[in-house]
Amino acid sequence: DLGRARAAVTLPRTRFSSPELAALAQETGRICRRDFDPPQVLSCKGMTTLLFCEKPALRAVFGTAGTAAKGTVSGDAVQQFCSPAAAQMILCDGMGTGRPAAVDGSLAAELTARLLKAGFTAELAARLVNVALALKSDEESGATLDLISVDLYTGTARIFKAGAAPGFLVHGGRARPVGDISLPIGILGGVNGQSRVVHLAAGDYAVLVSDGLLVDGPGWVAKQLELSAAAGDPPEKVARILVETARARAEQTGRPDDITAAVLRLEPCGH
């Protein structure tokens, strides 16, 4: 099943303790030559079914940092979470700055996260969020939508961008920008998003940034990410360094903007 093994065992209704479920997972894994998590237990009409799912090969570690252009209210919003099979990271940038931008950015990010958790694809989630922003008020509303979904069994990563700034992938220690220019959601009847599929491995990073971080272009970001990857920096530190450096550069140019970085690193899952 998409690179992962599943097993089901049905028996007369039985109660199991947590240690017993862990032991059953270990024995089932030995028989199937796979590593399983403790099973989900379903009981109905005198029968009990144990559902075993293979442990993922990877785990995701998240980090985020940000700063507002003025005051403490930022139009950027981040959501980072793991479903049973995938790591999800979302960055939305509300149009403009201040509280109106914060409302749009937060609405887009939170609604996208809920839809992904419910099983919607990125493309369909973007269409629904587009409608929500368009109906929110009579005033023009809009936000960028930037998300990456990483299969924790295979390392396959699906990237979707609508109006978002280029992101970055660090694979094998080399950083490269990802993404082209497209329109935000909420300002047109349709969604002009772009999607692509890449493959990541343990030790790789995925980075989403708002356009305020790229005031001086993407070159310095790629170099910094390669330095951080070589040092094995945790995602929280990577995000903080990017935001602090971008803020210093923005102050020199006199073009302040909301600045946000969201970072995901893949690590081997301990079995």
Region locations from a protein language model:
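Terminal helices and disordered tails flanking the catalytic cores of nucleotide-processing hydrolases
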Residues: 1-85, 135, 139, 227-233, ...
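Short, well-ordered beta-strand elements
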Residues: 9, 88-92, 206-208, 262-264
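PP2C/PPM family metal-dependent serine/threonine protein phosphatase catalytic domain
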Residues: 54-76, 126, 130-136, 165-197, ...
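Catalytic core of PPM/PP2C metal-dependent serine/threonine phosphatase domains
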Residues: 1-3, 23-46, 102-172, 247-257, ...
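Short, glycine-/Ser/Thr-/acidic-enriched flexible segments
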Residues: 14, 69, 85, 96, ...
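Amphipathic coiled-coil signal-relay and dimerization helices
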Residues: 8, 157-161, 176-179
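Cytosolic nucleotide-utilizing catalytic cores of signal-transduction proteins
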Residues: 77, 82-84, 88, 96-99, ...
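Active-site-proximal, acidic helix/loop segment immediately C-terminal to a metal-coordinating Asp/Glu
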Residues: 94-118, 176, 181-182, 187-189, ...
